[in-house]
């Protein structure tokens, strides 16, 4: 986006992410490793000047797979223990699977079990619990509704505006504090 800037953090892999997500990303990858899975970061920040950069230009999105994956095939990657662990646990660290399976018509992208996006812990847990994409969450926060065929029935009982975005630099041990009235402000 024009005028969007962020403090960059270069990972050991050479990829860049927004400094604000680094601690949560590190905590997630350390937990993944402790669970016995080896991983490789396959992508991160891409300048908005680069064609096809999309949300990578925010520094909030990155790709990660099992260590020995050569080709990003969703059918293969989604079955790898590393990516299964990441998909099941990423929300605890503030991340979502950005393009989940079965939501292609909503996201406009094929299933990508390696593509993760930071949204904050509260939003990530809410979205994952309620089977929501970022697009569906945005719709709910802005007063719209989503199909119960694509979201769990819990969405009707939960107020998404009660979800608060926390400081993305906070560690997982830190107390979550609201930094904004709108939980999507962190995404802009």
Identify the function of each model-found stretch.
Residues 1-159, 163-164, 174-188:
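Extracytoplasmic cell-surface/polysaccharide-interacting catalytic and binding patches
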């Amino acid at each position: 986006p024009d005028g969007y800037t962020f403090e960059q953090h270069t990972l050991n892999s050479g990829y860049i992410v927004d400094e604000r997500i680094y601690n949560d990303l590190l905590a997630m990858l350390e937990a993944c490793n402790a669970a016995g899975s080896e991983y490789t970061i396959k992508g991160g920040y891409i300048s908005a000047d680069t064609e096809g950069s999309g949300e990578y230009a925010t520094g909030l999105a990155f790709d990660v797979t099992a260590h020995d994956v050569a080709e990003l095939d969703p059918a293969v990657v989604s079955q790898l223990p590393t990516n299964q662990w990441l998909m099941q646990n990423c929300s605890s660290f503030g991340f979502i699977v950005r393009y989940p399976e079965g939501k292609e018509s909503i996201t406009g992208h094929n299933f990508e079990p390696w593509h993760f996006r930071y949204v904050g812990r509260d939003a990530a847990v809410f979205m994952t619990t309620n089977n929501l994409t970022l697009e569906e969450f945005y719709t709910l926060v802005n007063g719209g509704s989503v199909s119960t065929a694509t979201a769990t029935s819990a969405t009707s009982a939960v107020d998404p505006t009660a979800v608060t975005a926390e400081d993305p630099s906070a560690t997982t041990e830190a107390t979550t504090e609201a930094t904004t009235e709108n939980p999507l402000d962190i995404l802009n």
